[in-house]
Amino acid sequence: IKEIRKDVGSGFHMNRLLQGDVGSGKTLVALLVMLISIDNGFQACLMAPTEILATQHYTTLSKMLSKMNLRIEILTGSTKKAKRTDIHESLINGTIDVLIGTHALLEEVVQFKNLGLSIVDEQHRFGVAQRAKLWKKNTNPPHVLVMTATPIPRTLAMTFYGDLDVSVIDELPPGRKKVKTVHRFDSSRLQVFQFIEDEIKKGGQVYIVYPLIEESEKLDYKDLMDGYESITRRFPLPDYKVSIVHGKMKPEAKDYEMNAFAKGQTQIMVATTVIEVGVDVPNASVMVIESAEKFGLSQLHQLRGRVGRGNKDSVCILMFKSNLSDNAKKRIKILKDS
């Protein structure tokens, strides 16, 4: 925070990368920088790669700023036309203080009266040209803060983001424990299921994530529908309740399942990467990632960040078919070391 405050108060244009694991407090830092910007008479915007993440930021920041006389709006692909027009007009006349959104912020029609701060979350999900487009929304370039949960070695950060200063949040919030990361093969599935059963008996909850919704002839990966059947056989009603969440579900059904899990009404959530962001369940202590070789490092980090949000000992289990490729070995090592 001191580094960023110094940048903002220096009279020069800030260009900074903020790196910190999921749940380390990046949103809080972003909020404080926004308040500095607003206090000096500027508007601020925050761009996220998905509607779920943008909505999560909007909900969090709205709660935090509820007692302040500030106007916060959200603009995404699903924003209705009338609301969209109102937001466009309010941005230009300066009555919106903070705008949160997705790629919708990049549209030509989105113009600000006095943009002083641009924040980009999960910046690696956006191209350089896209980020630059956001920064050109003002006559004078705004201060820029880009955030990532994926650990980037400092030498690599200098290579890819040489124009950015780097700040690292290397501490977890008080009471938060580091998530243990292990890998297991399909041959150990019975032991993994037994571990899940033991955790549920202790009062914990479990995520099981799949790369695909349905079986594919082209891709030899575990799929969610098949997995859901085998999990409900192994963990049957009435002793166990299992939620299922994927991208083809209607938003209301998805929200219902997510809320049931968040309230502790179900013990297991079987899902695709839609739960990569936007789900905060402190009681969840186990994350099982099926066909882990299918996921990139940033996705694995985000998924692992869904557990370990309370004070329980938590574990992330990466499931593989059999032999590990060199790439898989490298990813596991990076995850275990971070």
Task: Annotate each language-model stretch with its function.
Residues 2-334:
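Inter-lobe coupling/hinge segments of SF2-like helicase ATPases
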Residues 337-338:
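C-terminal or mid-to-C-terminal helical accessory/interaction module adjacent to the motor/catalytic core
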